[in-house]
């Protein structure tokens, strides 16, 4: 039985690590009426909340819903294999609409994007640090000299916030631990499960999904530490998108939690709702990034 579990876990690990491989990126387009010459296609870029395949499974229904309910428009989901690829496209204004993390959201303002909304549930936008229950790790200082896995350097909740927590609790992140950036949330978690790292940084949503879908893996792990929260992932739009389209997208997103179809989509995202936001919503993120840059490592 143990050997079967290891084989299944290793298969899951390979799938989770797929964002770093040179594979075609998932970018399915959905339209309820087919491709018409009069329809305008809008590219919706969602940052690597999950690996591309998982992201496709979670967000494709939302693209189909928007396409079905906005006349003359179709929405194309674009996933990126990793944070670096997503950042490059976001800052080059490839996306018409985007769902970046708060760090990327703040940066996107300087690239011409406008914040119009965000994910709700700010209490869930926090970093968590997982360890194996049999690791023997008791305190932050036990991480000295150990490997800690993260999704990517620019992941706010899953990397920067845990690193700030470690730094402010007595361990120098840049000199006293071995930081490994492994490409995705799932990969970070699997690294600690497979003992490739002593601790794994992520955030609650991937951990909740794993605990539900793979309890055989989750039962070996525990959340040892968690950070304070910050505002959740933002919704931004490029300035050349017609205001009428932005208004309709906003209306549809902000009312998802009121209908059964919307609740089902939000459930896949482990989210209760989308809500309105603007630049002022993310002032606390800007302040955190300033502290992080001074106390942990410089941000590009």
Regions flagged by a language model, labelled:
Residues 18-45, 50-57, 61, 230-232, ...:
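An extracytoplasmic/periplasmic, membrane-proximal ligand-sensing/linker region
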Residues 135, 146-244:
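Pocket-lining segment of extracytoplasmic ligand-binding domains
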Residues 2-8:
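Sec-dependent signal peptide recognition
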Residues 84-98, 111, 141, 185-205:
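Short helices/loops that flank or line small-molecule/ion binding pockets
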Residues 131-146, 240, 247, 255:
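Hinge/capping helix and adjacent helix->loop/strand transition within the periplasmic-binding protein
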Residues 87-142:
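Acidic, polar ligand-binding/catalytic clefts
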Residues 13-16:
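C-terminal motif of bacterial Sec signal peptides marking the signal peptidase cleavage site
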Residues 26-102:
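Extracytoplasmic small-molecule ligand-binding "clamshell" domains
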